[in-house]
Amino acid sequence: MHLPDGLIPLWQAAIYWILTMIILALYLYKLSKTEDKQKVLINTAILAAVTFAASSISIPSPFGVPIHLFIIPLVVILLGPLSGVAVAFLCFIAQFLFLGMGGITSLGANVVTMGIVMSFSTYYFYRFTAELDDRLSIFSGTFMGIIMATIAQVVILLIAGVATLEVLLSTLVPFYLFVGVVEGIINIFIISFLFKLKPEMVEIAKVGL
């Protein structure tokens, strides 16, 4: 889902960068008001490292294209949506520098899709279903976060004029539907394990709006 440099017109890329900076500034402000700020920062650093490491792991898929887990929905469920945006921003810089994924001019657009849209979609779908069932809320938050990010990327690419709606829907949507299911199931196991092993990590203060 990482968009490379040169795909999006610079004036559009600048808008996505500005939006990213606004949300990151909001994150820093909210973080300064959060209880257990030190614990939040430590856990954010740990999950940022995990997210970066996970991006280098390829999982075979029936589509012939390997899956790279996002991990951002996991970060959001544990630390809140603004933390998800911050982790996405840090990881995308590291992924570009060390793995050649994404780009610099396209970084803002990537953060908008996989950081902002994915984080807030995950958070609110997770919260909306939390009263029904814990596993359902984890799965639905993860799955819908990935699907909404996919839709956001389709919109960004349509605005950039690089592909038709038919092509984007036929290539991106089926693949990320599959990714959403896989990562949703994985997150159920991870969070259930963390709740038993380190419940304080699951119950830590969230950085959100």
Residue ranges with predicted function:
Residues 56-65, 90-120:
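Interfacial aromatic-anchored transmembrane helix boundaries in multi-pass membrane proteins
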Residues 112-153:
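Short helix-perturbing small/polar motifs within transmembrane alpha-helices
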Residues 136-146, 165-209:
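C-terminal transmembrane helix-loop-helix hairpin of multi-pass membrane proteins
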Residues 33-36, 76-87, 129-136:
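Membrane-helix interface "capping/anchor" motifs
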Residues 41-46, 85-89, 112, 135-143, ...:
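Hydrophobic alpha-helical transmembrane segments
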Residues 16-23, 115-125, 181-193:
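Hydrophobic cores of alpha-helical transmembrane segments in multi-pass inner/ER membrane proteins
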Residues 149, 153-161, 191, 195:
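Juxtamembrane/transmembrane-helix interface segments of polytopic membrane transporters
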Residues 2-74:
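Hydrophobic transmembrane alpha-helices
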